[in-house]
Amino acid sequence: MNQSIQRSVDGLAPPGADSLPVWCVRAGLPAHLTAAQAAFLIASGFTGAAGQVVLVPAPDGIAGAVVGLGEDRSLWAHGGLAHALPEGVWRLEPGDFDAGQAALGWLLGAYRYAAFTPAKRAPALLTTDDALVIAIARATALARDLVNAPANVLGPAELAAATLELGAQYGATAQVIEGDACAEGFPALYAVGAGSARGPRVAVLDWSGVPDGGAAPLVSLCGKGVCFDSGGYDLKPSAAMLRMKKDMGGAALMLGLAALIMDQRLPVRLQVWIGAVENMVSGNAMRPMDVLRTRAGMTVEVGNTDAEGRLVLCDLLTAAGEARPDMLLDAATLTGAARVALGPDLPALFAPHTPAGDRMADAILAAGATTHDPLWRLPLWAGYDPWLATPVAHFNTVSSKPMAGAIVAGLFLQRFVPPGMGWAHVDTYAWNDAGRPGRPEGGEALGLRALYSAIVELTNINLPKKSRVHVDV
């Protein structure tokens, strides 16, 4: 089965479609209502509280809908409307809210993964001509689709093919490195995927937002694409393995971010490195206490085969760093320790405490606050670095101590990043355990809006207001 990245945006109405109005208020009633309509809303118990939705009658059907926002000023205030309103085409009337963020909340909430079964009902459609909102919704849907795809549909070959398809869509050059070339150039990554009948590969995408490339800043994105993680010989228990199709969530996030950058034609040079592998058990699989060579020339001892994501990323970071990018970002569903510390909604952000690292971290955190897409910075605490020591290799893949797992994983990756480079590492969950307004259960592109907005700020791109992501919080 093929996994195509081509899709429409759920909840988006065709341009020029006839529509019904939606009036959103924070308290009381909309001023324009007739006396009869106002009496109907009062009788319905409408007060403007968050989550209230009432259809306003008209002699020939429905005049529109009135929605309560209460004090919620996030985009999630509008996140449930695509499924709270009847099927049809609607428009948001101006009110005390950010129109772009309201539209984005609507479209994000309209998303459903329906590759194998039809949706129970179509979402209510929204009219909007905000190109950035539509692009964010499309990029988010791309990432969600990739994470939601079952592992028998999305393996290493299909994830690499999705990268090629994305490149072709935006006029980028892209290639896939596999076989002997992958084993030679990305030996640690290759060792992770060697146990699967579906071989490992690296997909690389190059794109320039300016005609000749020129002196445009180089942004490099690296994504962990473990399409299924059994844990290897350190086998996961059944409950922990259940959702491991989502272990390529970092790659999905980076592809969604790349799609948004290219769609908005940011004046940057972009490189994307996707490590597409499957961590399985076989006679060819890596074993505990194996010693592996990395692209950087350093050797690592495999302390646990279920700590495979850092082996994928270390070779990708080395390759990306060779081009000396102005910004180097990686994303991965890397550690359970990050989830213990921060839960499912807050990706952990790591960056070196250097001028370049602090600048990146500060920009990402600020962007997360303004886009309602938060991350939380954890330290790359140098005092824990000795915990990676081993007598048989340059260092181990895992800590010798049963604590600070997310930090030690970040310290491992930092060894493969050139000193002084602007680098940030995102340890994400990539999943919504339960549905909420704007955030359906399943795959999620946590951090996408924050990272995009931070790239705009960090590269000093002078964009019109509509090309910047913002929400009042």
Where are these regions (language model features)?
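Short amphipathic alpha-helical segment within the helicase RecA-like ATPase core
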Residues: 1-225, 466-473
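A generic structural signal for tightly packed, nonpolar segments enriched in small/aliphatic residues
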Residues: 160-473
